[in-house]
Amino acid sequence: MTHPDPYLRGHGDTRYRVHHYDLQLTYAVVTNRLDERARLDVEVVEPTHHLKVDLRGLQLGGATVDGAPARYRRTSGGWSVAVGDRRAGERLVLELKVSGKPRPVPGTHGEAGWEELTDGSMVGSQPQGAPSWFPCNNDAADKATYRIEVLTDAHYQVVANGTRTVCERQ
């Protein structure tokens, strides 16, 4: 079920919450190409057999649930991933392969999200921009922790909120 928040119309799914996102991104600046693997540690809140994942403008190229291949299909504003019959309180790990050329997401107060610049890119995600660059449950009440790993062209710098644990140049 889509969340009723007026700022996030069509975003979010109240049947689950994400406890942690683990994102591995590879970004080619010149072509604005993003390839990523996203791992979502999920808790089911309401009985369901599928979850709606918010992802706008990017392709889903594979999905697993607890390591087993899962069926998925495009829906309005994202993707529906089959998770089998799940009861409230169950935990699962959803892994998704994503690719494409990210772009901002339109919303009630204008566009937000991934923005391609003349020499690089930036992300401004409030309130609806997160699905422009990673698969998520875009519900402002669904708080989670994140680990983000980014591989990009050597002469670019990756900047993000949080604590940097490793910075390698190759």
Regions found by a protein language model. Give the residues of each.
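Acidic/His-enriched low-complexity segments
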Residues: 1-170
